Amino acid sequence: MKRTTKILSISLLVCLSIYTTVYLNLNRGSKVVNGIEISEVLLVHTRDRGIDYCEILSTATKGDEESIRELLLLEIYDAAGYDHGTVIVDLIKIVGEDKIIRAIEVMNCKQKTSITSYIEAGLQYGNNPNSAKQELNDIFPDVYNSLKC
């Protein structure tokens, strides 16, 4: 009887472990806003800083210049910075280079350098196979030229 109880306990723990793993993998904390995926890491990073990243991105994808500028100027650190770069790359594809250029034309050299770094990270480490491993000047030549200091 003791052995049966022990086997049932182990079986229950294994099942619970499998269920938890599957549940966590299926219910990741990422979100999709107007076709752009925002990673859980980026959501947590911005939420902890009181930034409504989804709202800013939602408005930016509709072409709002102020929201585009606000999104581009966010300072995102560590791993979330790579994800932010991926979001920027996807945003450029949705709204087009002209809207991005209008948003950045009033920025200073330091800001432009920061944006360049995010975009390059998004191109190198992003999850979009159409732009992965491409150079900024090849995929977005007009944005590249407007980001030069």
Language-model features: where?
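Hydrophobic alpha-helical membrane-insertion segments, chiefly the h-region
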Residues: 14-24
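Non-catalytic all-alpha helical scaffold/repeat segments
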Residues: 25-149
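N-terminal Sec-pathway targeting helices
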Residues: 1-13
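Functionally constrained cores in energy, signaling, and assembly domains
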Residues: 6, 19, 70
